[in-house]
Amino acid sequence: MNDNVAIRAEGVCKSFDGKGVLKGIDLDIHKGEVVVIIGPSGSGKSTFLRCLNMLEVPDAGHIWFHDVDITEKKVNIDHHRQKMGMVFQHFNLFPHMDILKNMTIGPEKLLNLPKEEAEKEAMALLERVGLADRAHSYPSQLSGGQKQRIAIVRALCMKPEVMLFDEPTSALDPEMVGEVLQVMKDLAREHMTMVVVTHEMGFAREVADQVVFLDDGILMEQNRPEEFFGNPQNERLKSFLGKVL
């Protein structure tokens, strides 16, 4: 596999209750690249994202993470998952732990980081997103935008090589979307490899290196944002963009 490819999907298929949700997806995600996946509801975007770290196991096809086929049964998937941060639509913070504990439990238990070092790194990340003063707050005391910023830096505490975002702003009030997108833009500027499922077309235009359009489980079009939005080739994509732009 090309040294510059972080993740490769080959012929990925997935069905639920006999209905094909992914129908042979091929996609290369290069190191340091931001790939944004868009498409209508039910097109398979989130399922595909969850296949990339095997939260959903493909029925057919392969997922390569660096040079390892992580769809192989003998692979220790937990070892590879630690290198892929994932941010969900509904934050998935532990409600009974304060923010600092939410952030340090992973590094302490999985990376064997000493408590003091884990807390120091967590506080530096909280400082970076302007939430150091909320270290001892609980998730229920935070706004949606604050929770999602915490969810992002919590994932970063594990020092991932890739970040996967599953509609990170869709559960937020409109005025909170910008603060979360800003954190993601900052990550992109630092050349973090990112795969983002989103409805935020402005983010896709501004930040993506590649934009991918999925519809009915099929990768219909993939291109750089200026071509993808400015000169779409696929008729279904033209129709979709006409409704959302």
Where in this protein do the model-derived segments appear?
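ABC family nucleotide-binding domain
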Residues: N4-P225
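C-terminal boundary and immediately downstream tail of ABC-type ATPase nucleotide-binding domains
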Residues: D215, Q222, E226-L245
